[in-house]
Amino acid sequence: MAASLFRALLLALALSVSVWAAGCRSVAPERFGELNPRLGELLLVGFHGTTLQDNAALDRLLCETRVAGVILFARNIVDAAQTARLTRGLTARARACTGRPLLVAVDAEGGRVMRLGPAAGWTATLSHQDLGQAGDLAETELEARRIGGMLRDAGINWNLAPVIDVGYNPANPVIVGVGRSFGANPKLVAAQARAYIAGMHAAGILTAVKHFPGHGSSVDDSHAGFVDVTDTARPDVELVPYRLLLAEGVVDAVMTAHVYNRHLDAWVPATLSRPTIDGVLRSQLGWRGVVVSDDMRMGAIEQHYGAGDAAVQALRAGVDLILIADDRLPGDRSASAETLTAIRRAVRRGRLPAGQVEEALARIAALRSRLTVAADVR
């Protein structure tokens, strides 16, 4: 217990020091004035409610915060017709307020991680584990295309899948234990993911491979708290799917993991780590597209860092898009509002370089420009 607390204090101290030391040169007022209205585009946010009507908090997200996108969960979904009405309203309202398309994201991996499931009237789907064990790439592409069609018809345009964590640790509770890995062979994982992405693209759905640099080795769950993979990680195995898929140009976005590996960064978990994101993912593997964080409300982050400081550190590390799965905080507070305040302060004071923010916004804009699901859902 004492060791865990000491480690948490060290990590929190490292975050505070690194954010403070990032640079003290304030951005020019004119440049900040140009950036400020767009800083909400660095956010992908989950909300409460199943309709836009009488939902002031949701309207603020779309028209005041001006988020790049929203993410749907079971709490937002009743059935297919309601979901289509909701997404149609979301996309229309966002475009009316901002003139830009809205990312409408969901976790629809298949199997147990499937927000559009039988309970809401959709048919059952196969998990990554099911598909990997079957070993039929044509079946994987067909199943992904079927899931993608479900998303398209519901007005969803971004699936935060596939999982390309290599499942070589049978004791892993959050990936292997719930059927979220295609398998223990990294080349098989890459092949299955390639087919899965092809199916999604055929349905007009964007994807995100996850969880970089690998969550398949852990013995803990980053949803619940701090996860240290220093002694279990195998980068020679876990980075293979990324290396192969990124080189082929089939990846739309990469999602990070909140895992700590002192061999990559002795101070902070991957999402907050510049050596991991900017160093390994961007410099070594050559990724130039969008990097989206995993949920910043997860225990691995929220239990150790303030939401705003963590978001600033993630952006400094090379993350482009900050995922906040639940915007509602105790006391009628907004996680996205507090995060945006911290980002604005960091940009204004020069702690988050304006040039880096502009690059992130450009990558996000390029991703949004590829959306193919129209506001009028078929």
Model-derived regions, located:
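Short glycine/serine-rich loop/turn segments
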Residues: 158-183, 203-207, 211-227
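N-terminal hydrophobic targeting/anchoring segments and the immediately downstream early-domain regions
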Residues: 24-118, 322-324, 366
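Glycine-rich, aromatic-flanked loop segments that form ligand/cofactor-binding clefts
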Residues: 91-123, 140-167, 189-213
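A charged helix-plus-loop insertion that forms the helical arch/lid used to bind
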Residues: 121-135, 179-183
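Bacterial N-terminal signal peptides
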Residues: 8-20
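Mid-to-C-terminal alpha-helical segments outside catalytic/metal-binding sites
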Residues: 347-377
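Second-shell residues forming the walls of enzyme active-site clefts
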Residues: 53-54, 78-95, 188-352
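Structural recognition of the beta-strand scaffold that forms the well-ordered cores
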Residues: 41-46, 68-73, 102-106, 112, ...
